[in-house]
């Protein structure tokens, strides 16, 4: 059985084709095509511009995916699309494309929860059996565990997502959005040597990111680091003595601020993930979502998991970052249980909770 998946909840448009062999063997990725809308440095991506990008590219990506998979339209069993959550206009553009293909090809539709898509793709690629899931992206920050045919949310951000926090600080520093602002923050953070004190906000199983962003934005403004910088290395030579005879402390660089932001927010994520592991008795962590590609986050989570006698599972950028193949995978799992999305119900929603989905394909 073959599913084609369309993903476009944010600035990445993905088309994936997944084969589920009839003998029940491991599913195979036949195609995983993606194109990203990149906004200018210092700017985020607006819904209308992102939707225009998706409309412009979706036909060519579908054709390319079919060619790469070496299949014809007749081989496709169902068309899966991201129903939500995400940005309204981009979601609508993908839903329209899915409905159009359904009518043209005479194939059934399957609306997929974006978050569940990440989880199921992560489970397939890594082989994680029943992990605590840390789902971290530009729009979501959740700690999840499976129970009674639902992916239960044990903790989440109380305001903005961790990826949103990193992306917005990249805008403050006027860092390039190519290939992604969060990735460029990560690379800059590797050069950081000074840990700047930032708010640390964990409330039980939940966390908050907006205060940290406000604090580090203020620091960047105080030290004149917001906006374009001619040369990052120039900042390192500015050394300012601390009062009352303490050790010398230099003016922080942009790299120091990126390093400090990552260390702080990732420490918070490790804490709430560990608390969930203790609660459900799991020794596995699965990190999914775009921020899950961050090597420092994986390293910090790995240290915690090993201390508990456990392990961390993560995927590379092919499957961690938004993609169509994860929608095809989750959609096919639902399709095989008999789930269908009638044409008149093939809408999309910006608010679609992970625990709203009845996970019929798991025990």
From Swiss-Prot:
Domain of life: Eukaryota
GO biological process: positive regulation of transcription by RNA polymerase II; telomere maintenance via recombination; tRNA threonylcarbamoyladenosine modification
Localization (cell): Cytoplasm; Nucleus
Residues binding a divalent metal cation: 114, 118, 135, 322
GO cellular component: chromatin; cytoplasm; EKC/KEOPS complex; nucleus
InterPro entries recorded: ATPase_NBD, Gcp-like_dom, KAE1/TsaD, Kae1_archaea_euk
Stored Gene3D superfamilies: 3.30.420.40
Annotated catalysed reactions: L-threonylcarbamoyladenylate + adenosine(37) in tRNA = N(6)-L-threonylcarbamoyladenosine(37) in tRNA + AMP + H(+)
Cofactor requirement: a divalent metal cation
Pfam family, one: TsaD
Residues involved in substrate binding: 135-139, 167, 182, 186, 294
CDD domains the record matches: ASKHA_NBD_OSGEP_like_euk
NCBIfam families (alphabetical): gcp_kae1 (TIGR00329)
Family the entry assigns: Belongs to the KAE1 / TsaD family.
Quaternary data: Component of the EKC/KEOPS complex composed of at least bud32, cgi121, gon7, kae1 and pcc1; the whole complex dimerizes.
HAMAP family: Kae1
Function field: Component of the EKC/KEOPS complex that is required for the formation of a threonylcarbamoyl group on adenosine at position 37 (t(6)A37) in tRNAs that read codons beginning with adenine. The complex is probably involved in the transfer of the threonylcarbamoyl moiety of threonylcarbamoyl-AMP (TC-AMP) to the N6 group of A37. Kae1 likely plays a direct catalytic role in this reaction, but requires other protein(s) of the complex to fulfill this activity. The EKC/KEOPS complex also promotes both telomere uncapping and telomere elongation.
Protein name: tRNA N6-adenosine threonylcarbamoyltransferase
Gene giving rise to this polypeptide: kae1
């Amino acid at each position: 059985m073959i599913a084609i998946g369309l993903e476009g909840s944010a600035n990445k448009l993905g088309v994936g084709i997944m084969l589920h062999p009839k003998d029940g063997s491991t599913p195979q990725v036949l195609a995983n095509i993606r194109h990203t809308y990149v906004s200018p440095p210092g700017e985020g991506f607006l819904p209308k511009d992102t939707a225009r990008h998706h409309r412009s590219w979706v036909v060519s990506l579908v054709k390319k995916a079919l060619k790469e998979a070496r299949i014809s339209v007749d081989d496709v069993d169902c068309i899966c699309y991201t129903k939500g959550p995400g940005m309204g206009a981009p979601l609508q553009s993908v839903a329209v494309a899915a409905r159009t293909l359904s009518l043209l090809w005479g194939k059934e539709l399957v609306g997929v929860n974006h978050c569940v898509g990440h989880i199921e793709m992560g489970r397939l690629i890594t082989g994680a059996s029943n992990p605590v899931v840390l789902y971290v992206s530009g729009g979501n920050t959740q700690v999840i565990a499976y129970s009674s045919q639902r992916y239960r949310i044990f903790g989440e951000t109380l305001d903005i997502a961790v990826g949103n926090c990193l992306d917005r600080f990249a805008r403050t520093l006027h860092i390039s959005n190519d290939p992604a602002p969060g990735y460029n923050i990560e690379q800059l953070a590797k050069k950081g040597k000074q840990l700047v004190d930032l708010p640390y906000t964990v409330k039980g199983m939940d966390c908050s990111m907006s205060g940290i962003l406000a604090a580090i934005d203020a620091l960047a403004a105080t030290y004149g680091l917001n906006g374009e910088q001619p040369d990052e290395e120039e900042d390192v030579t500015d050394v300012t003595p601390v009062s009352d005879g303490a050790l010398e402390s230099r003016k922080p660089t942009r790299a120091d601020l990126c390093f400090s932001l990552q260390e702080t927010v990732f420490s918070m994520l490790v804490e709430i993930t560990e608390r969930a592991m203790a609660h459900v008795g799991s020794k596995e962590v699965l990190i999914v979502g775009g921020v899950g590609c961050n090597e420092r986050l994986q390293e910090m989570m790995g240290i915690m998991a090993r201390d508990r006698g456990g392990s961390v599972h993560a995927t590379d950028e092919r499957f961690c970052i938004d993609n169509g193949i994860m929608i095809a995978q989750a959609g096919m799992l639902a399709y095989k249980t008999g789930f269908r999305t009638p044409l008149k119900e093939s809408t999309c929603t910006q608010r679609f909770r992970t625990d709203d989905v009845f996970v019929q394909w798991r025990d």
